């Protein structure tokens, strides 16, 4: 893997050096090391480990943040993909935006949480009959994944938290080599306000129109591929609203960042089909319309698991 340019490396270093310190860093590192050690020593040898990123990052406008710019993402794809990876035998580091969709919770009712419960008497509480099946399944699946040591959930909110945590995960996964995967489904901000240039306190609304100069977020994919975890299998995503430019931009991303595949999805059809763009050609992956419960992630993860298997075999020969 060729090294990244000095200019890009300087931009990345500058971003991290000027970022606010990551809270609970020592605890995060300890949890990651414990998780990886557990899945490295399981019966049958090393278990495959995937980092799934999910949800959108925020860009604070003040250091004591009241206002922010948001990259919206429900996190549904990341949550659904995590479930499928666990089903395929992977251990999953789920790096997710606080408040977004969680694994095993996609089929829970949209009603407010408290409406799922009822009081049969003064001393007991139980799940309402109409919701009992979904709640039971969600709790059982979630607890099984955690009890088996195959799901570690790490939350973020800001672009600063996300990128610092991604770097931590990648550098710790470096020793896992080809058995590790990155599935980068998070909606990451392209622009941000540098920490040292933003005001500390709430921006006053009475001072007239607000002009903000946004800097470009350094592209971390290049350094993830070349330095942080060069042997990991890496999948990135490209979302566009214009289908005419989608495949062209996905192909450019594939070539520029040297990832193993780019999942191209168009905003209006993203739940029905995606295109997996790779050096071996493009593959259209669709939801199985004959199965009402089917989601596109079922077939997408199945394809990527097969690709990862091939990659591991080739890496060991």
Curated annotation (Swiss-Prot):
GO terms for biological process: coenzyme A biosynthetic process. GO terms for molecular function: phosphopantothenate--cysteine ligase activity. Keywords: Coenzyme A biosynthesis, Ligase. Pfam families: DFP. Pathway: Cofactor biosynthesis; coenzyme A biosynthesis; CoA from (R)-pantothenate: step 2/5. Its EC number is 6.3.2.51. Homodimer. This is Phosphopantothenate--cysteine ligase 1. The lineage of its organism: Eukaryota, Viridiplantae, Streptophyta, Embryophyta, Tracheophyta. The gene is PPCS1.
């Amino acid at each position: 893997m060729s090294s990244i340019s000095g200019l890009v490396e300087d931009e990345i270093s500058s971003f991290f050096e000027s970022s606010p310190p990551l809270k609970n860093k020592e605890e995060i590192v300890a949890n990651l090391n414990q998780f990886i050690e557990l899945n490295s020593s399981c019966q049958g040898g090393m278990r495959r480990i995937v980092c799934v990123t999910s949800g959108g990052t925020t860009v604070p406008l003040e250091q004591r943040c009241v206002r922010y710019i948001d990259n919206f993402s429900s996190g549904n794809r990341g949550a659904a993909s995590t479930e499928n990876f666990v089903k395929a035998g992977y251990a999953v580091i789920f790096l997710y935006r606080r408040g977004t969709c969680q694994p095993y919770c996609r089929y829970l009712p949209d009603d407010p949480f408290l409406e799922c419960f009822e009081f049969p008497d003064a001393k007991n509480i139980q799940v309402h009959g109409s919701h009992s099946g979904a709640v039971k399944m969600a709790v059982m699946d979630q607890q099984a994944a955690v009890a088996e040591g195959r799901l570690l959930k790490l939350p973020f909110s800001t672009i600063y938290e996300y990128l610092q945590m991604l770097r931590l995960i990648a550098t710790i996964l470096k020793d896992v080599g080809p058995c590790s995967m990155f599935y980068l489904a998070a909606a990451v901000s392209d622009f941000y306000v540098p920490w040292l240039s933003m005001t500390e306190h709430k921006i006053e609304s009475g001072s007239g129109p607000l002009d903000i100069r946004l800097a470009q977020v350094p592209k971390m994919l290049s350094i993830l591929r070349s330095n942080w975890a060069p042997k990991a299998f890496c999948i990135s995503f490209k979302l566009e609203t214009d289908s005419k430019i989608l495949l062209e931009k996905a192909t450019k991303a594939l070539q520029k960042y040297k990832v193993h595949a780019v999942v191209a999805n168009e905003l209006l059809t993203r739940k029905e089909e995606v295109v997996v763009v790779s050096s071996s050609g493009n593959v259209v992956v669709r939801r199985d319309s004959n199965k009402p419960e089917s989601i596109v992630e079922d077939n997408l993860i199945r394809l990527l698991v097969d690709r990862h298997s091939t990659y591991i075999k080739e890496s060991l020969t």
